[in-house]
Design a protein with these regions (language model features):
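Short, small/polar-rich loop/turn modules that mediate ligand/substrate recognition or access, typified
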Residues: 94, 151, 206-213, 265-267
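Canonical Rossmann dinucleotide-binding motif of NAD(H)/NADP(H)-dependent dehydrogenases/reductases
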Residues: 10-43, 201
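Catalytic loop of short-chain dehydrogenase/reductase
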Residues: 117-119, 150, 155-207, 221
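Substrate-binding pocket helix/loop in short-chain dehydrogenase/reductase
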Residues: 105-123, 168, 235
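Amphipathic alpha-helical dimer-interface segment in Rossmann-like NAD(P)H-dependent oxidoreductases
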Residues: 99, 127-149, 161-165, 202-207, ...
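Short C-terminal tail/terminal secondary-structure segment
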Residues: 2-9, 101, 111, 237, ...
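Catalytic Tyr-X3-Lys loop
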Residues: 92, 100, 114-134, 155, ...
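Conserved glycine-rich Rossmann-like NAD(P)H-binding loop of the short-chain dehydrogenase/reductase
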Residues: 38-54
Length: 279
C-alpha cells in the first residue's frame, strides 16, 4: 500500500529506510543528505571511516548510521544489512554508489596508456563497481522479501563515461611534469556495465512482482580540488550549461528516483550532466 504521505507529497520519503554504498565519500554523503532531507533514515556503507563533515551529521541526526563494510564481501554486507534492520527496519531504498575512480594499488600505471594498464587495476574496478552492486543488491532483496515490503527503489550510479567515451585529449591538462594521465578504461567499462545491470535487475524485479524499481543515475563530472584550472576550463567549455557539477546538483534526481514521484519508471537512466552527453 502506498504510504499516505506519498499521496500528499510524491517526493516524501517519510518512513523509508535507505542504504547508500560509498556513503562516506563526497557524492555518497551528499546523496545521503538528500534522502535525509526528504524524511528517510539512511545507513552509510563504506570501507572508509566517516570524515569530520559526515561525522558531524551522524552525531546530529538519529536517522543516520555508518557501517564499516567491504561491499565486495557478501558476509560483511549481510552483517551490515542486519545492523540496519535492527536499528531502522528493512531497507526500501538502495543506492549503489561504491566504486573506485582508479586503482590506488597500481598508482601511476592505473592512469597510464592502455597498453600498460594493469589487469589488477581492471579487476579492482570490476570488483568495486559491479561486484559491489551485485552483492549489496542481493542482500537488499533478501531483506526486502523477508520483511514483505511492497515498494522499493534501487538506484545504480553510473557516469557520463558509462554512456560516452572520454576524450583523452582533455586529460592532457591533468598531466603534470610529463606524467602520463589517461582516464582509465576500467572505469568506463565498469560504469557502462552498471547500465545493463540496471536493465537486467529491473526486468527481474518486475517478473518477480517485488514492487522494486531499478534505475540508473548518470551524473556528470563534479569539480574537485585536484582538477587543474586548464582541465576545468576545457570541461566547462564543452558543457552546454557552462560549468562542472556541484555535489548538490544531484539532490533532486536522487529523491525523485527514490520516491513515488518516479513510480512508473524502471530500467531507465536519468542523465544529469549539464548537457555533456547531448553533444
Amino acid at each position: 500500500m502506498t504510504p499516505r504521505s506519498a499521496l500528499i507529497d510524491p517526493f516524501s520519503l517519510d518512513g523509508q529506510v535507505a542504504v547508500v554504498t560509498g556513503g562516506t565519500g563526497r557524492l555518497g554523503s551528499q546523496y545521503a543528505r538528500a534522502l535525509l532531507s526528504a524524511g528517510a533514515a539512511v545507513a552509510l556503507f563504506d570501507v572508509a571511516t566517516p570524515g569530520p563533515i559526515v561525522r558531524e551529521l551522524l552525531d546530529s541526526d538519529a536517522l543516520m548510521s555508518s557501517h564499516l563494510v567491504d561491499t565486495t564481501d557478501r558476509a560483511a554486507v549481510d552483517r551490515a544489512m542486519d545492523e540496519v534492520v535492527t536499528r531502522f527496519g528493512a531497507p526500501t531504498i538502495l543506492i549503489n554508489n561504491a566504486g573506485l575512480a582508479s586503482s590506488p594499488a597500481d598508482a601511476g600505471l592505473a592512469t597510464a596508456r592502455f597498453e600498460h594498464y594493469p589487469a589488477t587495476a581492471w579487476d579492482a574496478m570490476m570488483e568495486s563497481h559491479l561486484k559491489s552492486a551485485l552483492l549489496v543488491s542481493q542482500a537488499f532483496l533478501v531483506t526486502f522479501r523477508a520483511a514483505k515490503r511492497d515498494a522499493g527503489s534501487i538506484i545504480n550510479v553510473s557516469s557520463t563515461y558509462g554512456v560516452v567515451s572520454p576524450d583523452q585529449s582533455m586529460y592532457e591538462r591533468q598531466r603534470l611534469g610529463g606524467q602520463e594521465w589517461f582516464k582509465p578504461v576500467g572505469y568506463s567499462v565498469a560504469k557502462s556495465g552498471m547500465l545493463n545491470f540496471t536493465r537486467w535487475l529491473a526486468e527481474y524485479c518486475a517478473h518477480e512482482r517485488l514492487g522494486v524499481r531499478v534505475n540508473t543515475l548518470v551524473p556528470g563530472g563534479v569539480r574537485e580540488d585536484g582538477h587543474s584550472p586548464e582541465f576545468v576550463a576545457e570541461y566547462e567549455k564543452r558543457t552546454p550549461l557552462g560549468r562542472m557539477a556541484r555535489e548538490d546538483d544531484y539532490n533532486g534526481a536522487v529523491v525523485f528516483l527514490a520516491s513515488q514521484a518516479s513510480a512508473y519508471m524502471t530500467g531507465a537512466m536519468l542523465v544529469v550532466d549539464g548537457g555533456w552527453t547531448a553533444r
